[in-house]
Amino acid sequence: MATGPRYKVAFRRRREGRTDYHQRLRLLLSREDRVVVRKSARHMQIQLVAPDANGDVTLSSAISKELAKYGYEGSTGNTTAAYLTGLLFGYKTLAEGYESGVLDIGIQASSAGSRVYAALKGVVDSGLDVPHNSSVFPSDERIRGEHVAEYMEGSNLPEVFDAVKEKILAEFS
């Protein structure tokens, strides 16, 4: 570890690899609400966050665990669950009176066709206004889980996807 008067210690969250302060500053200066998408190995979490001088305020949120309420029994960490979580989040957010946001993926790698962009597609399909480029979205076959049904015997993920999507649409229609 370097020492001396010229050595500057980075912020703790930067050292831990948890916050990109340059990106955060750009997002905060836009003064728009952020659609924050975070993924773990088992779940997807999406929040609408408003900047505030006293700290960010969460306005609306959805997590993939909530899909069980709509009859989804598959893995909550896959592309299908990410899309359905985004769709659920979008409808919940619109019902609460919010109409737009800017995507915030944090320090996650931006990879076309990833779960992050599957969640964004769900948010956009619900009607929430989020600036995006549709070329980064995964294909509809991957979102429905048809690639899983091909190699996994007894998998009915596309049918479950359609049923859960209909239940979400029915609740918010």
From Swiss-Prot:
InterPro entries linked to this entry: Rbsml_uL18_euk
GO MF term (any one): 5S rRNA binding
GO terms of biological process kind: ribosomal large subunit assembly; translation
GO cellular component: cytosolic large ribosomal subunit
Coiled coil location: none
Pfam family, one: Ribosomal_L5e
Keywords: Ribonucleoprotein, Ribosomal protein, RNA-binding, rRNA-binding
Protein biosynthesis keyword on record: no
Family assignment from sequence similarity: Belongs to the universal ribosomal protein uL18 family.
UniProt cross-references to HAMAP family, sorted A to Z: Ribosomal_uL18_A
Oligomer status and interactors: Part of the 50S ribosomal subunit. Contacts the 5S and 23S rRNAs.
Entry function: This is one of the proteins that bind and probably mediate the attachment of the 5S RNA into the large ribosomal subunit, where it forms part of the central protuberance.
NCBIfam families xref list: PRK08569.1 (NF006342)
Protein name: Large ribosomal subunit protein uL18
Organism of provenance: Methanococcoides burtonii (strain DSM 6242 / NBRC 107633 / OCM 468 / ACE-M)
Gene field: rpl18
